[in-house]
Amino acid sequence: MHTTNNTQYSWAGSREMCLDEVSVKQYGDIVLGKYGGNISAGAKKNEDGALVWSNGDWEFTVILDGHNSAESVDLVVSTIQAEYENIKVIMNELIETVFRSVENHMLTIFQSSSFKEKCKRVKGETACLICVRKENYIWWLSIGDCLVYVFHDELHKLGQYTLNQRQFYEWIGNVNTFDLPVPCYSSGIRELRTGKNRIVMVTDGVLECGERRYETPLNLYSDMNKNNIELKENVHNILEHVHHQLGRDSATIISWDYENDAYATYPSDQPEKIKVKK
């Protein structure tokens, strides 16, 4: 079920902390879950952030995890928010060029002298993960240690879950990867499988609490696909688990489903599965 209306929402944990509180809301097709941390474990701030845009034809999402203040999160969210009209135009491009264009646009912004000057003036820095889905493809740009997964039964059977790898010494902000002689980040594009693809983005607070259940991707896959319940309820249950595991760090989840009716790629020795998209 896709919305036809444009959906725009952005959030920074400094404005709505959700300490000891799980908040799960839906914006268009996209579910956003927030949890600020367990007060009894010492949680007293939320430095995560998120931005979600969708219009039925595509989704553009950003998840952030700030360090040493939320100022860098506010800066990145407001900077991307100001680019909405430009990005909306880019998202109307043909599938052959759209991901290259959106990546070039984001890198141009992050490497601009004006943005880098603003970064020098903020306290702290942030991890930042951007994901874009259009048609049967997903693109991501990752700075730092947030993760994005694509959950699908075919991929699950082969043990494939994450799109990116966590990088623990990359940030945007006062310490800024885009100030290096060679900026460090990862990006990529994946074809989505035929049928239901569940896209899940998380900050490290989901992974690094208590027994660290969700550092094992299979556990996150299992709990995000439990009992045929609504996506919102799965997200809520995972953040409740973080709370009961005395998670001190804030935990944020962005998730949505994409039902792909296009044929996906198979190897040449499985001719019965190979079909050409008309």
Descriptions of predicted regions:
Residues M1-K278:
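PP2C/PPM-type serine/threonine phosphatase catalytic domain
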